[in-house]
Amino acid sequence: MRLARRRARVRWDEVRKEMNAHGVSVVEIQKGANGEWEMLNNGQNRRITAFTEMEITGPARGSELLVTAFSPNATRTRGTLNNCGSGFTPWGTYLISEENWAGYFHPDASIDPVPRELARYSVSGWQGNFWYDAQEGGIVTSDDNFSRFLTAATGADASEDFRNEPNNFGWLGGVRPV
């Protein structure tokens, strides 16, 4: 019953608002002459949301586990969802850490049991939201910003669908420039 009620409200405009509300804010501040903190308007301030395109760097770049229809060569990804700890390293890199992201993804309902690769991340049920099923005017959109949250293997390989999309979340990320 809960599933049916929630799914009835999945509209693309609501989902877009939810996705923009997730992420992290980067804001530069300074202490003013009066002792109050103030935001600096210097072009560095921004939101990093579920839609933000990012470059994959380091040893994971190009990994077959990160291949998706969005990035067949596994060099780019999109978004960050729930960030808990963040802060600066001694060398000045701003780090964000992502948690509690698994409930945003839904496995292929026709596969039982859920593949080990998804189950180990708790991407194993139909709990959470239904971003993958966003509808515009009652029609499921083809916008892969939404469908990427359904991890079904619908293509000939991972470069044609989003079966690997969960692997693009849950990372410790560096934000540049700060």
Feature-to-residue mapping (PLM):
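Conserved small-residue
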Residues: M1-V178
